[in-house]
UniProtKB/Swiss-Prot annotation:
Residues forming coiled coils: none
Organism: Homo sapiens (Human)
Protein name according to UniProt: Keratin-associated protein 16-1
Residue ranges of the region described as 11 X 5 AA repeats of C-C-X(3): 73-307
GO molecular-function terms, A-Z: structural molecule activity
Spans annotated as Disordered: 483-517
Entry annotated with the keyword Repeat: yes
Keyword tags: Keratin, Repeat
The keyword Repeat is annotated on this UniProt entry: yes
Record's GO cellular component terms: cytosol; keratin filament
Amino acid sequence: MSGSCSSRKCFSVPATSLCSTEVSCGGPICLPSSCQSQTWQLVTCQDSCGSSSCGPQCRQPSCPVSSCAQPLCCDPVICEPSCSVSSGCQPVCCEATTCEPSCSVSNCYQPVCFEATICEPSCSVSNCCQPVCFEATVCEPSCSVSSCAQPVCCEPAICEPSCSVSSCCQPVGSEATSCQPVLCVPTSCQPVLCKSSCCQPVVCEPSCCSAVCTLPSSCQPVVCEPSCCQPVCPTPTCSVTSSCQAVCCDPSPCEPSCSESSICQPATCVALVCEPVCLRPVCCVQSSCEPPSVPSTCQEPSCCVSSICQPICSEPSPCSPAVCVSSPCQPTCYVVKRCPSVCPEPVSCPSTSCRPLSCSPGSSASAICRPTCPRTFYIPSSSKRPCSATISYRPVSRPICRPICSGLLTYRQPYMTSISYRPACYRPCYSILRRPACVTSYSCRPVYFRPSCTESDSCKRDCKKSTSSQLDCVDTTPCKVDVSEEAPCQPTEAKPISPTTREAAAAQPAASKPANC
């Protein structure tokens, strides 16, 4: 090589070509400043670089891979890129290679090369085409240098994606660290068309567990995300023919366990949004207020209910929601809501294996089923008490404090009671929400009188449903009665009313006024 680069009389070879018409064969050539310390091979060009006279003497890149943006050639081959120098596409060619990109020249910014090429695609989403290479192409990762390892060559693939840029410019390879996202691409050179429904590639995100990447099936994505080192679905149990199919696994405590979807969920391991109380699912019990809309899919429940996660059961109707319980032991909090007036009949707790066996309606504690925190439960109604037509009833206000564990109560409507303490059997009183501490019940006591109305006009009475502020027996058809002087229809002497029964007694003025007999 004649001349000297220090004379400033030689041409500077562009990075896009090794053989140019601006430099005559045998003239001085200035090597790029970044690679002057390396050994370069200069080949004599013939016929204006139209033919090759050298044998294939390809060597490894003479500069580091991290900064290898300089050309490396053996035979004089001109490979003109289809993008500008500012876009970072600098081809490196060896031997005769056809520069035919997979898309139009105006839309493709990646050349076709034999050796490794570092390029940064600058095309848009609709025009992002993968390069067609003979062996391999290394692309600059789309993430920062600190989070990506050294680029690794991979087999080429022709893909016309319809997805975003993030799936077109991902680092490829298998030598990935725990902090490097890896894109698993098909190893065949056959065209792989990504459909719009499955355009996302297989991406392994960093996690505290070792994530395993598998090749997708028919462009189906499989996303591996961190799962707190304990994946919800460790191994597929339904089907192992394809990694994209669903697998059977125990549902997460943070997800509903009684849904209409199939038991086999997609094989996607996601991070738990909350710490589960227990890892086994609980069961949903349909309310008896309305017929169940979906068949019961009760599984083996656990002995605890997650209270910090999402609701396990959704309310099927505003009448009465489904009750989430567990067996064979008691949950942390056991709540049963009362039915509003929309329900035609009083609601009784359904008896099913998914509920505690010893918790019967109307009872809140027993030797096995004893609550440890506030709860609500139903008090079922009893049958109507018949009223006699020849006997009048005078209301007498008296508080009734029944033991909690003394069997069924005789109220006509389902009350929702609340125990704000750990109840023990046979406590003296219980409370009703929005009611006094002790429920005031009215009983009908016969009062002697002599009716003068005929048998056809006799007093007809009917028992209506009672509440804590209503009478058990109410006249439906008042009639005129001749009260004898011996036993007139007089009000009974007013008795002192405790503060507990003051609300109910105020609603019944019969204790201070004569009865309309």
